[in-house]
């Protein structure tokens, strides 16, 4: 009975971790080719406008350099100039394809994450008994720990998440989540989140220690502050 009681939560947690990912991955792969064909045939005009808006300054500089080169080659045979124009055209088409793929990946990533969210929401609603069982097992495990180990665990977790050396870790995590949703990397947004999110977590943790731990286990709070000092 004890093994069954432990096996069911483990199976439930495993399915939560892997099943949404498998379903979203299958959904993405099955619709990717169809979506690419649809986008290429229906959204070309929107795409070209978007390219001009996003890359106009960069492409002006690049084309200016190419025009200077064109002026230098005016004395060259016509075939050389034709090759130059062909190269410019190919580079422009490649730029359009690159932005096309980025835009499609953004939409596909966002769609698959929405699917994962609905799957996890359904799991939390339909698997209410399993969640209660997992909660009881976690509470029992934490209750059996000594106050010293509890304080050490809290201190280790807080130093990893909101310590002065956790900035690089938050940059990696937020950058990964940002990329997973298909958005282009924006250093200003990531820097803003890194500078504010740990502060919010630190405030929540201090409030939790003050309101909850002081009432439940004052000795744990004393040990925690002693180790923190």
Curated annotation (Swiss-Prot):
Membrane topology qualifier: Multi-pass membrane protein
Reactions catalysed, as given in the entry: K(+)(in) + H(+)(out) = K(+)(out) + H(+)(in)
Record-level Gene Ontology MF annotations: antiporter activity; proton transmembrane transporter activity
InterPro entries named among the record's database cross-references: CemA (IPR004282)
Family affiliation: Belongs to the CemA family.
Function in brief: Contributes to K(+)/H(+) antiport activity by supporting proton efflux to control proton extrusion and homeostasis in chloroplasts in a light-dependent manner to modulate photosynthesis. Prevents excessive induction of non-photochemical quenching (NPQ) under continuous-light conditions. Indirectly promotes efficient inorganic carbon uptake into chloroplasts.
HAMAP family, alphabetized: CemA_PxcA
The name this protein goes by in its record: Potassium/proton antiporter CemA
Source organism: Glycine max
Protein encoded by which gene: cemA
